[in-house]
Amino acid sequence: MHRRALFLSGLAGPALVQGFAFMPEDQLLALLRLGGLNLYLRHAITDRSQVDTGRRGDRAGQRNLSEAGREQATRLGRAIRALNIPLAEVLTSEVFRAKDTAELAFGPERVRVQAELIADDYTSGSAGEDAHATSRLLARPVSGGNRVLVGHIVPLGMILGRGLAQQEFPEGAAGIFRPRGADWEFLGFFRAEQLIRAAGI
């Protein structure tokens, strides 16, 4: 059944996601090295003393990466390169914590802002419509490597059909999707520390 239809209708989304049989880490790594997957990467660790205002383009009015988050993003990029995981493109939310994560991990020259990846409290339209558009993007096949989408926890929960706990999808984690054109298959989560450990850095 089409995953996006479940999100839009609100039918059986939680049961579907809970029924996923996540792949073991070594199998996921092998698939990532082959390319053709979509990685929904949550921004790196943030400074929780800062409060979001919902104002776009206002760094001082947003929750930004902490020093630990900047280091995490840099190490995550190094880990992906060390693991020989090929990348075709890197798309990001315009919110600074996501854009900074993308640029620190993959280099500013590779990063392109994608409007629908915006955080739910910064959207100028409907968070549901943005999540729907992102779900379509996750279903879109990619050649020449993997596609990285740097975004936020709430939109991914909307796409999967249930709220995600911080422990389940912490800052710096990635959800791995196999695109099928008309829909997608969710393969599981990778935490940042898993990739960093696997790379031995």
Give names to the regions the model predicted:
Residues 1-21:
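N-terminal export signals
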Residues 5, 70, 183-185:
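Residue-level signal for well-ordered, solvent-exposed loop/turn and beta-edge residues enriched
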Residues 10-11, 105, 159:
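Hydrophobic residues on the short alpha-helix immediately C-terminal to a glycine-rich phosphate/catalytic loop
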Residues 22-115, 120-123, 128, 163-174, ...:
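Active-site-proximal alpha-helix that buttresses catalytic centers in soluble enzyme cores
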Residues 103, 135-139:
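A broadly conserved amphipathic alpha-helix scaffold signal in soluble, globular proteins
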Residues 127-135:
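Internal catalytic-core helix/loop-beta-alpha segment
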Residues 138-187:
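Active-site-adjacent alpha-helix immediately C-terminal to a catalytic or transition-state-stabilizing loop
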